[in-house]
């Protein structure tokens, strides 16, 4: 038979754990979409030519962003903000990866992707693959993209999403932001994910 004292001790511990859980409640600056954002999942090729999956980045907070290297405005601005956020995290930034998925694999060859991502941050990785692989990942995160008409020189723009998706160290879909999200907000939220 369990003594009354043991029951009281167990009850006290339960209350303490519940209160500790309440104290850990997170307040996000970006949109918390953990109930609807799918976990990180893909099969692509990194800008170093390695076949990679979401498992390749387990243990890191992953920031997923779709774009292309010929993008004239939104992509470089967003990548710059993400890189600045990683830098502002200080030493903890080594546990973050910016995963830049190219929606323009015809022009974004591995060397082009590598030069582009590394110009922003050593924690950035360019990802590419077959069009089917890219479309699979885009569809998973409801990212639409389409190609503009080629000009006389063969150049074209790609209309795509400006969303950024942030995943916890175990790959859980957690937050969504955009090219309008402030560096301060990204740093604030990623720091919380790193602490988990």
Pin down the residues of each PLM region.
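N-terminal export leaders
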Residues: 3-8
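C-terminal motif of bacterial Sec signal peptides marking the signal peptidase cleavage site
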Residues: 19-21
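Bacterial signal peptide processing site
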Residues: 23-25
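A short beta-strand-turn-helix
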Residues: 43-62
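Short active-site neighborhood of thiol/selenol oxidoreductases, capturing the structured segment around
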Residues: 56-74
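Conserved helix-turn-beta segment immediately C-terminal to the redox Cys motif
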Residues: 79-100
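Short, internal strand/loop/helix patches
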Residues: 114-161
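Thiol-/selenol-based redox modules, centered on thioredoxin-like
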Residues: 152-196
